[in-house]
Design a protein with these regions (language model features):
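Flexible hinge/switch segments at interdomain interfaces of large molecular machines
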Residues: 1-9, 45-51, 86-107, 135-141, ...
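Extracytoplasmic/periplasmic
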Residues: 1-81, 86-89, 111-138, 513-582, ...
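Extracytoplasmic/periplasmic membrane-proximal domains and adjacent transmembrane bundles
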Residues: 9-12, 54, 80, 124-303, ...
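Short helix C-cap/helix-to-loop transition motifs enriched in small/turn-promoting residues
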Residues: 32-44, 62-90, 122-131, 166-175, ...
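Helix-loop junctions and hydrophobic alpha-helical segments within the transmembrane domains
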Residues: 280, 287, 291, 366, ...
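Hydrophobic transmembrane alpha-helices and their membrane-interface caps
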Residues: 303-311, 315-366, 370, 428, ...
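Transmembrane alpha-helices and their membrane-interface boundaries in multi-pass membrane transporters
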Residues: 355-369, 391-410, 417-464, 579, ...
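Signature of alpha-helical transmembrane segments and their immediate interfacial
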Residues: 388-390, 461-516, 630, 917, ...
């Protein structure tokens, strides 16, 4: 896929140990105020999670995201009142990374040894020539934990903060200047940094004058291990840690994948017994297959186009026409990097899409030259005359096609990268085709030898028979039909309008399924689980194991030839879990990944303690987790919660709506500390109380040290058994500023409450997100969205909760933005097409005739979707937009021919008939080359073609029907325009006569 640079800026601020409410008030609100007035920010969303603040800024497409990023960094740096315990803010521009391959190390090995081995393997992978980014997945960060019991601290009159300060004093490396001697400078340095458990045990806490010494190892339990977090990572049923290898920037994914695969094969021979290493999720295998499929389809398309040209035209002429294709392709390929393009699945399809179109210009020139040569003989003058006759309309015809592809380059969002990758290739190819057909092709055609009259070769005889058959078709089938259509031109128009209305009805009705964002089958199925807050780690693991085992059992129940499972991985993090299954190639499966996902979900049954679960066998092309998404915004939190529940229940009334999620359903039990008035007499303030409780239960960060690639925190805190209950809190002692110790209950009181697990805000106001998935075989996301936003529910919500505002979010918002942008850019493109047609036609009215037939091209596209059996989507619309350019291209040639005949004194009706019959071969040829160039893709069943087939169907089938439009409807409309002019002249004449009388 093309590299996607999203116009989204993220601000992540870790706030260790803080509740969502503290994160909101202490960090999020201050960042929002600092950045809200920066020009160019289109949307601002924030998420206050336990221990983490996240702010997401959408950049307006009319602004430079990198410039906005710099402004955001400066604005955040200027905030002076952020809490002191936060970590450094991380500010970056979002970018979708291309995962090339994953490596999994698994087996029966303890966590410490396993991570050490994985770190070594990570270093070895990063040393490969093509690899620059390889991240460890499914492993906890290292941490040195210093745990001291309350009783031991009291025994020696120490506090946790005292211990942390002692570590900072003794564990450090400090440069101490230098001695400037006559023999040179001698550096002075104190080296005492502790790195391992044994080093920390020797740190001195107390050293009395009588020689009594107390070290950290005497009173503390020191663990050189991992952070306190839930850890569960399995691969094919065994403990595992993974490494994800990414392609960065313009790196070649295939080279990276090949190097890593070769490394894994070699490294597997040196691992200890019981430990395995395996590469999986090889995205480049899919890429290589896709490239091979696209190249084979391109080759087949070229052959088919050449065959069609060889049937209609002289073989030499067909060859020179075809030569324009590689010239245009090479030119586009050379300039593609300058247009921020790359060689990927979609750009390859762009070359296939333009196969038949790129030769249209050359076909028109070549066919005109052949016609002139057949009529007047082959000579340089006749070649020039034939080329000049159609040069002007052919050039502007290609330019109008270019104009129709411009909207594909301006689609916003991540989804916009798909049509943009195609459009950039097509535009470059078409521009090069103009140069080739006008400057190079005529010279080649002039160099051809005259056709030999005594040529009786089988090919020439076949061409003669075909030419005779074509003449018969034109004279005895097409010409009479055209005459009848022109004579009954208003009836003909009515028939076409009726067909258009009928086709539109098919879209609006149940006959053609419509989805804005089509789903795509993949080689993976995924289960994502979020547990209710407060769920024990053991319960989360139990649910993930059940999901894992149920899929393995489902696979084992299949006959040997129908087994679908290749690899399966499971991960748990706090209250979330994921199971990812790699399937065998989709083409070899007896059932679709979507069906496997449904069967998996049914086999699992009810899962206790699960807040949300998603099992997907298809990838959503819009890139969002849900198909529909609504944002409810209000300053009144209670009213907001009621409105959110109302919308949640309303969505449950629709058929086909499932996995409805309410972002406000999660909650965390919270204990609020309050200081008693009696504590003030002891010199205690709330900050003293809070800091000591935080030190005991979260810990004091004594220092951070660098060990190899990882930064390791040194945390000082109570032992785990003294942090597990309310009793532990109530039994702790608080130290006054004078050094005295008082019971916690004597100076503090507790207030229990519940707070949301995540606080969402939009433009500084609280927001709740209601989202859901849609079964597109039952209903359409757009219909649900329109009904909620524009229907009775919106009125009911406004009446009951006037302070609550409802907006679209996620995929729904992107669909709305895409629709608006498509309407705007398509309208501008139509104005551009009109201007480009007005120049060669030298008329303001005749371009309207041609533009009037553009909607009729949709009829063939819709018929194609019915035949192929695919839903009508946004990608289908892009195909119709491209179709408009081809329709206009052929129509300009026809109308220009009529104009020249009329200018020579021919009757308009006769001129229209002559134009149709004489341009029949050229128009038929351009249409057939376009269709047959796309035919291999239209018949493709592979996974890699799913994204591009809707565009190919719209353009391929649409162009066949567009041929009928051009050859029948355009002549009728031309004559009808003359009727209107004649009627206007008569009306003016009659008025003049009346005024004179």
């Amino acid at each position: 896929m093309p590299d996607v640079q999203l116009d989204v800026i993220s601000i992540d601020v870790p706030f260790p140990g803080a509740s969502p409410g503290e994160v909101e008030s202490g960090v999020v609100t201050r960042i929002e105020e600092a950045v809200r007035n920066i020009e160019g920010i289109a949307d601002m969303r924030s998420y206050s999670n336990p221990s983490l603040a996240r702010v997401r800024l959408d950049v307006d497409t009319n602004y430079d995201a990198l410039a906005i990023l710099d402004e955001v960094k400066m604005a955040v740096d200027r905030i002076a009142n952020l809490p002191g315990s936060i970590e450094n803010p991380v500010i970056y521009r979002n970018q979708r990374q291309q995962r090339a391959i994953s490596v999994q190390i698994y087996g029966d090995l303890d966590e410490v040894t396993m991570k050490g081995l994985v770190s070594t393997i990570q270093d070895e992978i990063l040393s490969l020539p093509s690899v620059t980014k390889a991240d460890i997945q499914g492993a906890r960060p290292y941490e040195i934990s210093v745990e001291l019991k309350e009783s031991r601290l009291r025994q020696y009159g120490l506090s946790l903060d005292d211990v942390a300060k002692a570590i900072r004093r003794s564990s450090l490396d400090l440069p101490a200047g230098s001695i400037r001697s006559d023999f040179g400078d001698i550096l002075l340095r104190a080296e005492g940094q502790a790195y391992r458990k044994v080093d920390f045990e020797k740190i001195m806490l107390i050293h009395k004058s009588d020689g009594t010494r107390l070290t950290l190892g005497d009173i503390a339990k020191i663990s050189d291990g991992f952070q306190e977090a839930q850890f569960y990572s399995m691969f094919n049923g065994k403990p595992s840690i993974g490494i994800s290898v990414f392609a960065v920037g313009e790196q070649n994914q295939i080279n990276i994948s090949n190097e890593v695969t070769d490394y894994v094969k070699t490294r597997s021979q040196t691992l200890p017994d019981g430990i395995s290493i395996e590469s999986w999720g090889n995205g480049t295998a899919y890429l290589s297959e896709s490239i091979n499929i696209m190249v084979s389809n391109m080759t087949m398309g070229i052959v088919l186009v050449l065959v069609i040209l060889g049937i209609f035209l002289r073989v030499q002429l067909a060859f020179w026409v075809m030569l324009g294709m590689p010239i245009a392709f090479l030119g586009a390929f050379a300039l593609l990097p300058l247009a921020d393009g790359s060689l990927n699945l979609l750009s390859l399809f762009g070359f296939i899409l333009v196969l038949g179109i790129v030769v249209d210009d050359a076909i028109i020139i070549g066919e005109s030259v052949q016609t002139a040569s057949e009529r007047d003989g082959h000579s340089l003058d006749n070649v020039i005359r034939g080329a000049k006759r159609v040069a002007m309309p052919a050039t502007f015809g290609v330019l109008t096609t270019v104009a129709t592809f411009i909207p594909l380059l301006t689609v916003p969002g991540g989804f916009g990268a798909l049509p943009a990758a195609i459009g950039s290739v097509v535009v470059l190819c078409l521009l090069f085709s103009i140069i080739e057909s006008k400057l190079i092709l005529p010279a080649h055609l002039a160099s051809m030898k005259p056709l030999q009259a005594n040529d009786h070769s089988p090919l020439r005889q076949f061409q003669n028979r075909f030419a005779d058959g074509l003449k018969y078709l034109v004279e005895y089938k097409y010409r009479p039909l055209l005459i009848k259509s022109i004579n009954a031109r208003y009836t003909t128009l009515a028939v076409f309008v009726g067909m258009l209305i009928l086709a539109t009805g098919f879209v609006m009705g149940p006959y053609i399924k419509t989805v804005f964002f089509p789903s795509m089958s993949t080689d993976f199925i995924r289960a994502q689980v979020e547990m209710v807050d407060g769920t024990s780690p053991a319960q989360v693991v139990k649910v993930i194991e059940r999901l894992n085992d149920s899929l393995v059992l489902l696979n084992e129940e299949q006959p040997e030839d129908d087994k679908f499972l290749k690899n399966i991985a499971a991960y748990v993090s706090n209250t979330n879990g994921n199971v990812i299954a790699e399937l065998k190639p989709v083409d070899s499966l007896s059932q679709s990944p979507e069906n496997i996902a449904v069967n998996w979900r049914n086999s699992v049954g009810e899962l206790s303690g699960v807040k949300t679960i998603q099992i997907n066998g298809a990838q959503k092309s819009h890139g969002h987790s849900k198909d529909i998404n609504f944002k409810l915004i209000s300053p009144n939190i209670k009213e907001l919660e009621v409105a959110a529940e109302l919308l949640h229940q309303h969505l449950r009334t629709y058929d086909g709506v499932y996995d409805i999620e309410n972002s406000n359903t999660g909650s965390i039990p919270e204990i609020n500390l309050k200081i008693k008035s009696s504590a003030e007499a002891l010199g205690l303030a709330l900050t003293d109380l809070a800091s000591q409780v935080r030190a005991a239960f979260y810990g004091v960060e004594a220092q951070r040290l660098q060990r190899g690639r990882e930064e390791v925190k040194v945390m000082v805190r109570y032992p785990r058994e003294e942090r597990e209950s309310m009793g532990n809190l109530e039994s702790m002692y608080i130290r006054t500023r004078d050094g005295d110790e008082v019971p916690f209950t004597a100076v503090a009181e507790l207030e229990t409450r519940v707070s949301p697990s995540t606080i969402r805000r939009t433009w500084g106001k609280r927001a709740i997100i209601i989202s859901a998935d849609i079964n597109k075989t039952i209903t359409q996301p757009g219909k649900i969205v329109d009904d909620v936003i524009l229907g009775d529910f919106a009125l009911q919500l406004a009446q009951r909760h006037p302070n609550v505002r409802i907006e679209l979010g996620g995929a729904s918002q992107e669909e709305d933005e895409l629709t608006q942008r498509m309407l705007l850019t398509t309208t501008l493109a139509l104005f551009g097409i009109y201007a480009l047609m007005a120049i060669p036609l030298k008329s303001y009215l005749q371009p309207l005739i041609i533009m009037g037939v553009i909607p009729f091209g949709m009829i063939g596209a819709l018929i194609g979707h019915i035949i192929v059996g695919i839903p009508f989507s946004a990608l289908s619309v892009y195909g119709i937009i491209a179709l408009a350019g081809v329709v206009v291209n052929d129509s300009i040639i026809l109308v220009d021919f009529v104009n020249k005949s009329v200018a020579n004194g021919m009757d308009i009706v006769e001129a229209a008939i002559k134009a149709g019959t004489e341009r029949f071969r050229a128009i038929m040829l351009t249409s057939l080359t376009t269709f047959f160039g796309l035919l291999p893709i239209l018949t493709e069943t592979s996974l890699s073609a799913q994204l591009v087939i809707p565009m190919a169907v719209s353009l391929g089938f649409g162009i066949l029907f567009a041929t009928v439009i051009t050859l029948i409807l355009i002549p009728c409309l031309y004559v009808m325009l003359n009727d209107i002019k004649t009627m206007r002249i008569r009306l003016i004449s009659s008025r003049s006569a009346s005024s004179e009388s």
